[in-house]
Structure formats: C-alpha cells, structure tokens
C-alpha cells in the first residue's frame, strides 16, 4: 500500500524525470551486426549531449561504472559469445550512486541466453510506463528540430522466488512501418539490500522515438524456455511536434488558450540557454527557453536549489510579457532571464525552472491523470569559486646603507648601462639586417618585375592565344566586298555582313556604301585603288551579279534595275579587276541558289553565309576561328540573320521579284551620247573632208602609188603657196613695222594646214618612218608631258598615273578649246601650227 500511494508515485515520477539519459540508440535499421562500427563512426556531437544542450543530464561515458567484467556477454545462435558489447553507456543516476546498469543493442532474432527448462523462467515485468516528454534544445542550437522527444520507459519485477532466476531484460520497440529495435539489459550486478523492495528499471532515449507516431514496447524476461517466454507489452502515442503545430492549427494563440488548455502541456520540459557565474559579485545569471505559444503558459518560476535538490534557496516569477524574443536561423525563440544575487561561495547550487501550472483564471494548464502538475527542469550543480586575495605589499620606507648597495653593485657586473648598450647594439644589428634583407628582396622583386613586363600584347582580340598563332601579329587585314545591287534587302544583308566582319572579327572592310566620298571624288581612282590595297577580295554571288557577268561576257545588252541606284555601275567596273586579284574568296547568302556562281570562280571553294561563316573567317584571317566570338547573343550576328530572314520572306512572297525589278538595256552608240559628254579634239587634229560622199567612195591604192600621188600633190601646193605669198606682200606695200596676224575662222586657215602636213611628212622622211604619225601618238606624248608637269604625281603609284593619263588630260583639252589663240609675234608658219605651239607654251617648252 505504501508503494501505491499518490505522493510516492509523484515523487517517483519526478525522480525518473530528473534522472539522466539511459541510452542513445541508432535509427530503426540498426542491428547487432552493424551496431558496433556504426557507434564508432558516429561523432561525439551525435552520441553525446553537451552540458548546455539538455536539461537535466550529464554526458554519457563510453564505459560502465563497474568495468568490463560487468558487460553482458551476448550469445548469437549458440555459436559462441561476444566479449565486447556493441554499445555500453553509463546510465547511473547522478543523485543516487547505487543505481547502475549495462545496456547493449542486439538483433531482435539473436538468442542472448540459452533456453532453460520449463519452470525455471523468471516472472514477467509489470507496471510498464511510457512517459514521453517534449524538451526544447538549448545552447542556441535552433534548427529544424527545435524540440526533442525524450521518452522514458520504466517497469518493475515482482518480488517472487522465481525473480532470482532473472539475468536480463530484452526490450523490443515496435515503431511505425513495422520497424523494430531491440536492446538487452544486464541486471546481474543489481544489489538490493532490502529484499522487500522491488527495484524499478528505466529506459530513456532522445532519438529512438518520433513525434506523432504509435509505439509498442515489449519487455521479455530472460532467460526463457522453449515453451514459455515471460513478456509484457504497452502501447503509447507520442505527442505532436510543437514546431509543426502552428501549421496544423488554424486558430491564433489567443483563441487556443481561451477556456481550455493543451493536453500535451504537461509533457513539455524547459531548458537552460545560458548560465553565467560571476564570483566577484556573487551573482548567477540564467537564461531559459520558454514553451511554444500553443501550450498557453503564462508564468515561469525559476528556482535555486541546494546540492540535494530539495531545499529551495531563492525563487522568482517570470511572466510571459517579460520574455524576450530573438530570431535564430529564421525562427523566433522566446527566452527569459533572471539574476540570483548574494550567492554563497564554494557551495553547490542547482538552477531549476518550471512553468506555473495554473492560469490567471484558475484553470489547470498541465493536466495529468493524477491532477495538475508541470515538469521541472533541473540543471547540474554549479559553484561560485572564491577568489583568493593577492598577498599584501608593504609601503614602509626602509633606510639603506650605502656600503651595502655598493657591495651589491660590485657583486653584479651587469649594470643598467651595460644593458642599455647591449640592447642598442642588438637593435642596431637587427635594423641593419632588416635593411639588407629589404634591399635584397627589392632587387629580386625589381628583376622579376622587369622580366614580367617584357611580353607581347595581342592587340587583336579576335585571335585566341593558342600555340598555332604567331606571337607577332600582322596588321589588320583589309577586305574588299564586291557585290551587285540587286535589291534593298540584298544590300541590307551585305551591309550587316560587312559590319559583322568589322565589329566582331576586327577586319578592315571596304564597301562602296562606306566609300561614297572617295567614289564621288574620283570613281576610276577608287575602283583601281580599292583592288590594289585589299588583302582579300570577297565576291558575293547573287542572281543579279550572275546575269550581269554573263551578258557582259557574251556582249549582249546589259541588265540593270528599273530604279537604279547611285552605286549600281560600280560592280561592272570593279568585277573585272577583282577577278584578277590573287586572293579571291567566293561566297553567297543562304537565300541564293548555288547555281548562280560566276563561271570564272566556280572552281573555288564556295562559302554559304551564315552556315560557313566560321570557316570563311578562318580563310580570311588565316588563323583558327574562335567559336566563342559568336557564342551567346551577339547583336551584330543577330542583325545579319534578321536581314537574311527578311530577304527569304521577300523571295517567298514574290518569286518573280527579279523579273519585276530588272530590265534589259541596249548599249548606246557614240552618236547617241549627249554632246557635253564628248571631249572635242583640237582643230589641228580634225579631218577636213570637202566631199564626204566622195571620201567614203575613195578606193584603196598600193603604198607606192600612194607615195607618188602625195608627192605630186605636195609640189602643186608649194607652187600655189608661193604665188599667194607674193600677192600678199604686194598688198601690204612692204610697209615697215610688226606684222599683226588676226585670228581667223577655221575656213581661212585651211590652206595653212597643208604646209604643216608637208613639214610632218618631211620629218617622217628624215626619220625613215614607214607610216604617217597618227593623232593618237601626239595625244599620248601630250599626256606624258602633262604627267611630268603634275606636282602631286607619284611615279610609283598606279592610281596617280591612271588619273593623270585620263581625266586630267581631258581638262587640259577643254582649256585649249576655250582659251583664245592669239600671239602677235608669231609668223605665218607658227600661226598655222597654233595648237602645237600653244601646248608647248603652256607646258613651258620653248
């Protein structure tokens, strides 16, 4: 009756709660065969609890209090024994040194002891209790598992004669999903002085059980017979996880705490966060973690107990309004603070905290089967150590004897002067060594810096720094693009392609659209120089370029756009010279049929844009192309693709676009050209024919007959000229003075042209020339002299020679026709040859 009294049961419950952790287990899949290496590999933070992590507890030790001889020897299948247990922990009570045990994890199918005869079995256990407790984790270790489920399993064995046969207990824990974990308890070392008292056995774990699941605990008394296994079972539902409660509950904390209490509040235990000891001011500062809001606790009582844990020395009440809140790892944590003052030194004290079980309206917050009671959390004993006082020092003055001091100085050869000199010398030596080391390091660093500064810079980022690329890069490659102006969409694609070569691959690209200033200044010079200065020539094949080349080769009427552009004629002039370039690259856009390739370059490798763009770039730069230049989104390359897409859409919408936008143009004859486009010849070079019809019907004579005919005609003209000169002198009457010759019309000067021809024939006879000097030879001589007259002429530049031989000479001819030919001091023969003399006077030849 005494054992079953309510007071004793409450005291026993609190006693069991205050006890330490009995065992720490592995997860459900732990077996006897794998428990030993698993326990050795687990870190101490997983197996052992820190001093500030659990309240109340003390860290388990890896050996029993009795030593190895008390370890249970587990037998497996009768094959032998295992000397070393898989896991042995000290589960003794901190307040009761007489309680001891030894625990092993085994396989559920293992036989610990051999079977005994029937009737030799120990009695089965009774009064099995499963007490789950929700404990908050301390030491600021707030993570996903803010709370820990601590479960205590306790039972008793009846005091019978058969109890002497008891050697061990086998504890089987059946968890969810059919997972089982088994333990064996050695009770052979248990000594009970009073045979009338039945001992109570206790098993606790912090990791074996989970929140919100049903567990069945079966206790088997060992050894057992083949016919009977004395065992007892108990089932318990674990409380819900406080961290997951706010997700499940829709009501607020105030609504949950109105008029009722949480049934799981009696299973919650607090924990200490920090405990500070200040011996100088005799103060102990504690911080404890409060319960979640769903438990509805309104006040907490902090206590300071003596070393026995029974006498309360100090206490205080902390309300929920006085709690502080911190955010740790994204989770709100509430804790309370209190300072215990006037603490006695060198005395063991136990801090404790317990929630107040009643609310302000008097209802019970910790409802239990036997009444209203909350769990108290006790910490391990702490002590304020007394601080020892330093030894006292005397401030009294003493008389000194000069002789004694002198004797002391003589005994000690080292004086403060010696120390000062020695210290100065050492400092000087160290300074000199540091300076020398610094200078040496500086020289070494400077030499390395000079060596590192000698390197070759890659000014063209289009090339990668690979071994196949020369260290000394060439100058930027000049590229000329020759294309036909077929349509606005084709021109846009060519322009985007040129921008891609210029901006992405860093090439010096020349295009007629970009060189319009040079074209307007001198088209012929641009066409010639653009071919000469280009390292590479890119010919873009298209349908318009193909037909223009074919018709020009077959000498058929040309083809051009109905609405011509200012640069449409550039292709016809530039293509002939471009085909003579040593480095010609042929390409076409993807919308152009490969059959429209020029017949002169169809033997070359054809590049399709943009499909063969990287291969074409390698041919242009003569270096390996880098694909990363077009990796990702490139705005210039996207513009090229968009232009090609627009051209494709244009072709699909109008398949007959080329026939609709182009037409054939017949070649115009010279007579059809406008008058202002023809440069007139000087009068002396014009052929004068009196009867054009007769001139056209003239017969061809042999060269001998032609010479005789010209000789007879020359004699006749000389006679006529002499008679006219005499008549002219008679009319003038030989009056003295200068003779002024007025400019006459071309008809008056016609007779004067014959002496010029006669003089030329005389010169031809003297030089033994087979044919008469033509007009073309005279113009070429004039052009040669004009070239030497040009101050800006560069004899080594083909462009300047071309310009001086064509356009500049035409300007000189215009000046000759427009300028009056007057010279009063010239005689009649020079007047007949005024054009030639005028040229000589302009050039400066006398």
Curated annotation (Swiss-Prot):
Outcome following mutation: residue 292 to L: Defective aggregation behavior
Residues covered by the SEFIR domain: 476-618
Tissue: Expressed in most neurons.
Record-linked Pfam families: Ig_ILCR1, SEFIR
Predominant cellular place of this UniProt entry's protein: membrane
Bias (Acidic residues) ranges: 744-771
Record key words, sorted: Cell membrane, Glycoprotein, Membrane, Receptor, Signal, Transmembrane, Transmembrane helix
Lipid bilayer topology: Single-pass type I membrane protein
Biological processes, Gene Ontology terms: interleukin-17-mediated signaling pathway; positive regulation of locomotion; response to oxygen levels; sensory processing
Biased composition (Basic and acidic residues): 400-409
Protein name: Interleukin cytokine receptor-related protein 1
Organism: Caenorhabditis elegans
